[in-house]
């Protein structure tokens, strides 16, 4: 039974290594623009830099990591990295940093 498991695992690894997949998207036509980047494409260079610096996902720390049980700890670490005195996840799953 153990030998069969090892053989299946090796076969799975080899198939994953040698399978040729294309992770890159195909060529887009000139008239088709991706909507996700349309805000950043239309901004001048100074505004683009400011938009990138101020882009925040406030719920990412508490929402995404709450499934692993480290939501509040990750929020506190995030706030300490921002030179605050810690933080917590509120009822809406938004990280709130203490001053």
From Swiss-Prot:
Primary location recorded for the protein, binned into one broad class: secreted
This protein's GO CC annotations: extracellular space
Reported induction: By bacterial infection.
Domain of life of the source: Eukaryota
Keywords (A to Z) from UniProt: Antibiotic, Antimicrobial, Cleavage on pair of basic residues, Defensin, Disulfide bond, Immunity, Innate immunity, Secreted, Signal
Tissue expression per record: Hemolymph.
SUPFAM superfamilies listed in its UniProt record: Scorpion toxin-like
Protein family (similarity comment): Belongs to the invertebrate defensin family. Type 1 subfamily.
Protein name, UniProt field: Defensin-C
Species this chain originates from: Aedes aegypti
Taxon lineage: Eukaryota, Metazoa, Ecdysozoa, Arthropoda, Hexapoda
Gene designation per UniProt: DEFC
């Amino acid at each position: 039974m153990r030998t069969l498991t090892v053989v299946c695992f090796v076969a799975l690894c080899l198939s994953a290594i040698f399978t040729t997949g294309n992770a890159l998207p195909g060529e887009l036509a000139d008239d088709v623009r991706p909507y996700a980047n349309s805000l950043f494409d239309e901004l001048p260079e100074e505004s683009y830099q400011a938009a990138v610096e101020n882009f925040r996902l406030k719920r990412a720390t508490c929402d995404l990591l709450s499934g692993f049980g480290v939501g509040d700890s990750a929020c506190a670490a995030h706030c300490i990295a921002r030179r605050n005195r810690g933080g917590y996840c509120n009822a809406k799953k938004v990280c709130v940093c203490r001053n």
